[in-house]
């Protein structure tokens, strides 16, 4: 919420398949903004169109930073998946995505409730 300068929701996500290493430093070597990399891109993203996809409700993302400017062309979207947990499991790795920030199904339902009637929502994707 920009008016009170605080996050409305914060939750763990599964990242791209190359970004799940056993310690944080190595994860930064496995980020990419390149098409076909199947790696995560960090930075701020505008939450765009809602749609029903392969994994249920999903939202297209438009990258706002140079580190994630290709999110839309890479088809990186925000979605839920049953193999992602609602709680941090670090230092163990989660099952990776092809670059999408993936929430647990439960958390995605909560996020969807917040996003359904909003516009101009920005998320911050980080490791």
Cite the ranges covered by each PLM segment.
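Cell wall/extracellular polymer interaction/catalysis modules
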Residues: 1-98, 105-122, 127
């Amino acid at each position: 919420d920009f008016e009170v300068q605080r996050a409305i929701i914060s939750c763990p996500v599964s990242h791209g398949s190359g970004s799940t290493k056993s310690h944080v430093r190595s994860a930064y070597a496995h980020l990419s903004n390149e098409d076909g990399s199947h790696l995560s891109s960090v930075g701020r993203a505008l939450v765009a169109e809602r749609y029903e996809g392969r994994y249920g409700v999903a939202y297209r993302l438009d990258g706002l930073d140079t580190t994630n400017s290709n999110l839309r062309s890479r088809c990186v979207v925000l979605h839920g998946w049953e193999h992602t947990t609602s709680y941090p499991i670090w230092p163990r790795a989660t099952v990776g995505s092809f670059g999408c920030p993936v929430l647990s199904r439960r958390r995605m339902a909560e996020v969807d409730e917040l996003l359904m009637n909003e516009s101009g929502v920005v998320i911050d994707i980080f490791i």
